[in-house]
Amino acid sequence: MQKKRIGKSVVAALAIIAMSAGTVAAWADGAPRTNDFWWPERLDLSPLRQHDVESNPYGKDFDYAQAFNKLDIEAVKKDIRATLTTSQDWWPADYGNYGPFFIRMAWHGAGTYRTYDGRGGAGGAQQRFEPLNSWPDNANLDKARRLLWPIKKKYGQNISWGDLMVLTGNVALESMGFQTFGFGGGREDDWQSDLVYWGAGTKFMSDNRDKNGKLEKPLAATQMGLIYVNPEGPNGNPDPVAAAKDIREAFGRMAMNDEETLALIAGGHTFGKAHGAASPDKCVGAAPAGAGVEAQGLGWANKCGTGKGADTITSGLEGAWSVDPVHFTMQYLDNLLEHDWVLTKSPAGAHQWMPKDAQDIVPDAHDPSKRHPLMMFTTDIALKVDPAYSAIAKRFQAHPEEFKLAFAKAWFKLTHRDLGPKARYLGKDVPKVDLIWQDPLPVAGYQMIGDADIAELKRRILASGVPKSELIKTAWASAASFRATDYRGGANGARIRLAPENAWAVNDPASLSKVLKSLEDIQSGFNRNRTDGKQVSLADLIVLGGSAAVEDAARKAGYDVKVPFSPGRVDATQAQTDVASFAVLEPTSDGFRNYYRKSNERSPAELMVDRASKLDLSVPEMTVLVGGLRALDANAGHSRLGVLTNRPGTLSNDFFVNLLDMSTQWTKSSSADGTYEGRDRKTGALKWTASPVDLVFGSSSELRAVAEVYASDDAHEKFVRDFVHAWTKVMNLDRFDLKRS
C-alpha cells in the first residue's frame, strides 16, 4: 500500500517548489498551464492518483517485505559502521565521524510526522524529493544521502531508502556508545513528491501561525521549512520562554509529551555540532531544487573558504554542546544546567548562547590544535527556564539510566511513529514489548471460524432485526477510521465500541450502541456454545454484518454476489487504546456518510477527496462507494441528503442515474445552509435534496465522466461488482496479515 496525502491546495504546493527552482522561469514559453492555473477553485483529484503503481520502477508485483527479509542486516550495519569513520574529501566528517550527521538525517526524515492527519514521517523517504530536500532545515543533508549511496547501491531493492536512513541513525547512535531500543523495517519508498500542505506561507521561514497566533492545524512545524521550531527562538527572537511554548506545541503535535521531548533534544544534542562559519546569505547558493543540472541534485554550494569542513555553513549557528561530540555522555544536561548562559552571536550572526565563564574547551571538528567555547541554542536554554522541562532535565541528570531509556524509547517512537502497528514491522531487531502508541492488539487464543460458521453468523445477523442500513453504517464507521498516512485505525480491534470512537458524532452513538449490543449478543451466543475451539471476535462480526447487509441489498437489485470475508480480526481492550491518541482520528467531515462540520475551513468536496486519499482509494473507487452508500441509506444522522433513490436499501446505481437526469434542476436551498434542492424542471416539484459532495459528481468534469459510466444502462452489474470490490478493500485496509500472506 502506498501512502496518499493531499495538500490544502496543489497551487500552494507548486508555489513552494517553484520558489526553489530559480533556474527555471515559472510557466516558461511552451510549458502547459495546468487547469489549476486558470481555475484554482476546481476540485483537485490528483491526491487520488499519486503514487500510482506505474511509477514504481520495481513493478506492481514487487514485494518489499519479501525482499527485506532476504537482507543480511548485520552486513548492512557493518557497512554503515565503516562509512561512519571513512571521511570523504568532498565532504569531510566532523571529528572524523559522520555519526551526528546521520542522526540529523534520520531525525529530520522522521520528524515531519504530525498526528492530526498522519502525514510526514520516515516512510517513503520523502526527504529525497522536493520540497523537503530543499527545506532550510534540511540544508546539507543531500550530502548525507550521497555518503550512503554506495550502501544503497550495494543492497538495492532489499533495503529502501526509508529503512536505510532510519537504520543508519540507529547504527550511528550505537557506534557512539548508546544502546537503542530496536529497529523495525518495512518503509516502502515513494517515487514522487507527496502533495502535503506544509503551510500557507509563500517563502521559507514564514510563520505558520494563524491571525490569532495559533499554530495552524494540521501543521506541527512553527515556521515554513523547519522540522520543528526555530533554534534561535520564535521567528528568530531569542526568547527562551517563548521558545519553550513553541517546543511544547510542535513536539506535542508530533505525538511527543514533555518527557519524550526533553529526552529527544537532550539526547540528540549530545552529539555533533552546528555549522555557521559565515553568513549563509553571503556564501551559500541555491538549494538542490534550484541548483543547475551540473550539480546533480546537490545544493547549498558554499563559495566561502573551502566550502566544507571548517568552513561549513548550515544553520548559521556554530559550535558544539559538549567537549566529546562523538560519544554518548551526560555532558549536555550537565552543561545546560550547571552553567549560566549569556546571549551572543555566531560568526554568521545567528543568535546563540555561551557560558558566562566561557572557556575554549571544545575540540575543533577538523583541527586538533584549536579549541572553542561550548554553545547552546535558544531552544536549549528554553529547557532550563521552563519549569516543567527543567524538572525533567534535573531528574534525568540525577538518574542517567532513566535518561538513557527515555531517549532510547523516544528515538524509537520518533523513527517508527508513521510505520503503523507492530504487525507491519520487519526484521529481527523489532522489540518484543508492545507500546501503547503502536495501537497494540491481543493475540487470538482460539481458532478462526470457517465457511459454515460464516454462513450461519450472517443468517443470525440478518435475522436479528437490526436495520440493514445500520449494519452497513457500523461496518463502515469501524473500517473507515483507517488512514493510510500512518496506518492507524481500521476495523481490527473493534475500537468503535471503545472510547473515544463510540462517542464520535459521525458514528451516531445512540444508534451505534444498539447495533453493537445486538452483535455482542450474537457473538456471546455463538462463542458460548462452541466445543471445537472456534470463536468469533466482535471486530469480525461488525465487518461480517456490513457485508451480509451489502449482499442482501445486492439481491434486492437482482444480483447474487458474495462479499469476500476473511476472519482474523481481534478485539482490543480499552487499556490498549490511548484515548487522546485516537481522538485525532475523529472525522470532522466524511463525504461517504454526508457528514460535515461547519467549523471546517475547507470545502466538503475537498475533504471528501482528503478522506478518500487516507483510505487509499482511486477516483473510481471513491465514486462508486459514495453512490453505493447513498443508495444503501448509510448517511450519518439518518440524513436524506443525496439519497437519490425511491428504493433505499437496494444496491442500485440510482444515485448516478438521478443525479445526471436533466429533468432535474438544482438550486441552493433558501432554508438550509449547505443544502441543494433538486426540482422538476417543468413543475417545480421538489424531488431530491443533496449536499455539495453529492452534486460535485455532476459538476466536476472528471467525476462526472466516472459518474456517467455508472449511470449507463449497461452498468448495473458493473456498479454492484465495483462497489463490492471497493467495499472489501476498505474493510481490509488494516489487515496487514492478509497483505503479507
From Swiss-Prot:
Cross-linked sites for Tryptophyl-tyrosyl-methioninium (Tyr-Met) (with W-107): 228-254
Record's keyword annotation contains Heme: yes
Description of post-translational modifications: Formation of the three residue Trp-Tyr-Met cross-link is important for the catalase, but not the peroxidase activity of the enzyme.
Active-site residue list: 108 (proton acceptor)
Cofactor needs: heme b
Catalytic activity: H2O2 + AH2 = A + 2 H2O; 2 H2O2 = O2 + 2 H2O
Residues the UniProt record annotates as site (Transition state stabilizer): 104
SUPFAM superfamilies, sorted: Heme-dependent peroxidases (SSF48113)
Superkingdom to which the source organism belongs: Bacteria
Cofactor note: Binds 1 heme b (iron(II)-protoporphyrin IX) group per dimer.
InterPro entries for this protein: Catalase_peroxidase (IPR000763), Haem_peroxidase (IPR002016), Haem_peroxidase_sf (IPR010255), Peroxidases_AS (IPR019794), Peroxidases_heam-ligand_BS (IPR019793)
Signal sequence bounds: 1-28
Pfam families reported in the protein's UniProt record: peroxidase (PF00141)
E.C. code: 1.11.1.21
Keywords recorded for this protein, A-Z: Heme, Hydrogen peroxide, Iron, Metal-binding, Oxidoreductase, Peroxidase, Signal
GO CC, one annotated term: cytosol
Segments forming a coiled coil: none
Function as written in the Swiss-Prot or TrEMBL entry: Bifunctional enzyme with both catalase and broad-spectrum peroxidase activity.
HAMAP family: Catal_peroxid
PANTHER family in alphabetical order: CATALASE-PEROXIDASE, HYDROPEROXIDASE I, BIFUNCTIONAL CATALASE-PEROXIDASE
Protein name: Catalase-peroxidase 2
Provenance organism: Burkholderia ambifaria (strain MC40-6)
Gene: katG2
